Amino acid sequence: MEVKTFAFLQIAVCIAIGIELICAGTNALNDEELFTVDYCGTNCTQQPNGSWTTCPGNCSCYHEDGKTDGFCLSTEYTDFTQFPNLTSEEMDAATPRPE
């Protein structure tokens, strides 16, 4: 009797964990937040005095510990929840018109 109860509880826990993982996976796919990383086309290097060469524009130098070279990357976080849902009329008004 105890073995059957223990086996039933194990199965119930496995099912609960599976449902939780499925829900977490679908929730992660529906997040309306976007983090983008773009390569700026240049690299950065550590100078003999310990400082790093500058990156162009809004790019920053990212490097591994102990390495003397890195990549110039631009990072941006966009939260799409701050934008309202547009109506059809607003979409039509924002559509470019041919000349």
UniProtKB/Swiss-Prot annotation:
Keyword list, A-Z: Disulfide bond, Glycoprotein, Secreted, Signal
Domain of life: Eukaryota
UniProt key word Transferase: no
Ranges annotated as spanning the membrane: none
Subcellular location: Secreted
Leader peptide range in chain numbering: 1-28
Keyword RNA-binding among record annotations: no
Entry's Gene Ontology cellular component terms: extracellular region
UniProt GO molecular function: C-X-C chemokine binding
Carbohydrate-modified residues: 43, 49, 58, 85
Disulphide bridges, residue numbers: 40-59, 44-61, 55-72
Role: Salivary chemokine-binding protein which binds to host chemokines CXCL1, CXCL2, CXCL3, CXCL5 and CXCL8.
Protein name: Evasin P1162
Organism: Ixodes ricinus
